[in-house]
A protein has these predicted regions:
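Sequence/structural signature of beta-propeller modules
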Residues: 2-68, 73-74
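Amphipathic, soluble alpha/beta structural segments
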Residues: 11, 117, 128-131
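A generic short-segment signal for beta-strand/edge and adjacent turn/coil regions
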Residues: 28-32, 38-39, 63-66, 99-102, ...
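A short beta-strand motif characteristic of beta-propeller blades
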Residues: 35-43, 74-82, 105-118, 147-154, ...
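Short beta-strand elements that form the blades of beta-propeller/WD-repeat-like
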Residues: 49-70, 85-100, 104-106, 122-135, ...
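A generic structural signal for ordered alpha-helices
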Residues: 118-121, 125, 140, 147, ...
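Extracytoplasmic/periplasmic C-terminal soluble domains
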Residues: 145-186
Length: 186
């Protein structure tokens, strides 16, 4: 039995070595064309060169660490803001807030103050929509574009998911419920 085992082990080792050699030889093929991205421009976010906004420029917003702002497709930074705690930014608005935020001023991409949100909570900007997640984690408010409260919803379970569109919003709760609201809160 020992002799038979030695022969079978040497057979399988030899077979494995032959398979590996054949695999290496047959698997060799030239690599396809590789695509490499080369940047058209770079921005040093430690000390950006802020330039005035041109009227025909399409703005792109960014949030990186404790900084946020807007830049053009040409790479010109037109607004650069540092914030101490948290912030929210969209194509139309930006704001920063603290952990015990009682109100938050919000601004347009060109740094003009558009209004104040006088609701205790955490603002979220999504395109041209303003939401405030209220303390406790189970409620939110929808605001008008001047920051005044339009309507509010309070649930029993904490909010775990949220998405909005021009037609309303969808909220997911920790108990598994998903609720859809139109723009009027129905």
């Amino acid at each position: 039995i020992l002799m038979k085992t030695k022969k079978s082990i040497s057979f399988f080792i030899s077979l494995s070595v032959i398979f590996c050699i054949l695999y290496i030889i047959l698997a060799i093929k030239p690599l396809g064309k590789e695509y490499q991205f080369t940047p058209e421009w770079k921005i040093d976010v430690a000390s950006p060169n802020v330039k005035p906004l041109k009227d025909d420029s399409q703005l792109v917003y960014f949030k990186l660490g404790q900084t946020m702002g807007y830049f053009t497709e040409d790479g010109d930074v037109v607004n650069f803001i540092t914030f101490p705690f948290k912030a929210s930014i969209s194509d139309y608005f930006y704001t920063s807030y603290t952990a015990n935020n009682k109100s938050a001023k919000f601004y347009s991409p060109d740094a003009k103050q558009l209004g104040t949100i006088d609701i205790l909570g955490f603002p979220m900007m999504d395109k041209d929509r303003i939401y405030v997640f209220l303390p406790g984690g189970n409620a939110f408010a929808v605001c008008n574009q001047d920051g005044t409260k339009k309507w509010e919803y309070s649930g029993f379970s904490p909010i775990t998911a949220f998405d909005s569109s021009a037609n309303g919003c969808v909220v997911g709760f920790a108990d598994g419920n998903i609720t859809e609201f139109d723009t009027n809160g129905n």
